């Protein structure tokens, strides 16, 4: 969403969610984040965020982590295995690598780093044999970082961009509404092809995958193409899969009244941007 919508619009979305009914003046990002945390505590009270003292972005409080981890268990067949007995030493070691990825992200695009720090209030590590972490709409602003030892800092940075994007899409939907009837999203007749997994998935999951793939492609334009990526496919493969996802999603949209104008706006922006990327890739090949 950062590359789709821009820095100022990302801030605007957080402001509209958290401050639209506030009387006080919001004249700093820290004040905005404080109101954002209050908003999340009000609407997602099962995963409370501490408001006393300075909130540490890297969380090792196992009792708090357990409450968040429940929300990351997933639904259906894609349930991750989460090791709630992960030792503290493993958490601290993993989070030090996450910090290196976050530093790289900030170096590549400081504005993206600012949005990350505004939106993501909690990063935590728990081991998993079958997942690399994730985000959930049931606990916005959290990222489960089940990073792997063989990942480079570039891999970790891409993972953070990936999960930030999921969070930004969740906030955007909360603010503007994307769908006319969420109960129809998991109807198999409304499935669309994922850009990342390249399989048919529920409609909103496919849309998330498309926006994530777009953001990673745009991020790589600034960070460079990884020589041996472990988190996402090579860019040309991801671009091709993303264009297929666009057509798959449009096929559903054309045959239903499932989406709101905001959804169509984002889809149009992503499609235009992907075609621009396609032309730039073709130019590189020709040269």
Can you annotate each of these PLM segments?
Residues 28, 35, 61, 104, ...:
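Charge-rich, solvent-exposed alpha-helical interaction surfaces
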Residues 26, 140, 274-287:
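Low-complexity intrinsically disordered segments
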Residues 136, 150-158, 170-198:
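Post-HEXXH active-site segment of zinc metalloproteases
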Residues 165, 169:
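Short active-site segment of divalent metal-dependent hydrolases/proteases
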Residues 73-139, 149:
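Auxiliary, metal-adjacent structural segments of Zn-dependent hydrolase domains
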Residues 1-73:
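N-terminal low-structure segments adjacent to metalloprotease catalytic domains
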Residues 113-122, 126-136, 148-150, 188-271:
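Metalloprotease/metallohydrolase-associated module, dominated by Zn2+-dependent proteases
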């Amino acid at each position: 969403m950062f590359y789709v919508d821009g820095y100022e619009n990302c801030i605007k979305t957080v402001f509209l969610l958290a401050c639209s009914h506030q009387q006080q003046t919001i004249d700093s990002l820290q004040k905005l984040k404080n109101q954002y945390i209050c908003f999340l505590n009000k609407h997602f009270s099962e995963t409370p965020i501490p408001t006393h003292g300075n909130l540490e972005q890297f969380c090792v409080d196992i009792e708090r982590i357990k409450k968040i981890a429940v929300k990351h268990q997933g639904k259906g067949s894609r349930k991750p295995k989460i090791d709630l007995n992960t030792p503290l030493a493993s958490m601290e070691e993993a989070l030090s690598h996450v910090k290196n990825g976050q530093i790289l992200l900030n170096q590549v695009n400081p504005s993206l780093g600012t949005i990350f720090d505004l939106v993501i209030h909690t990063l935590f590590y728990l081991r998993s044999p079958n997942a690399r972490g994730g985000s959930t709409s049931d606990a916005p602003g959290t990222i489960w970082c089940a990073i792997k030892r063989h990942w480079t800092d570039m891999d970790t940075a891409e993972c953070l961009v990936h999960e930030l994007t999921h969070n930004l899409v969740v906030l955007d939907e909360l603010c503007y509404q994307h769908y006319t009837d969420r109960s129809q999203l998991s109807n198999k007749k409304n499935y669309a092809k994922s850009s990342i997994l390249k399989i048919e998935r529920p409609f909103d999951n496919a849309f998330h995958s498309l926006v994530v793939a777009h953001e990673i492609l745009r991020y790589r334009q600034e960070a460079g193409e990884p020589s041996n990526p472990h988190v996402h496919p090579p860019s040309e493969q991801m671009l091709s899969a993303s264009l297929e996802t666009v057509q798959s999603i449009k096929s559903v949209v054309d045959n239903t009244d499932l989406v709101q104008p905001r959804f169509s706006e984002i889809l149009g922006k992503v499609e235009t941007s992907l075609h621009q990327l396609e032309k730039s890739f073709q130019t590189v090949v020709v040269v």
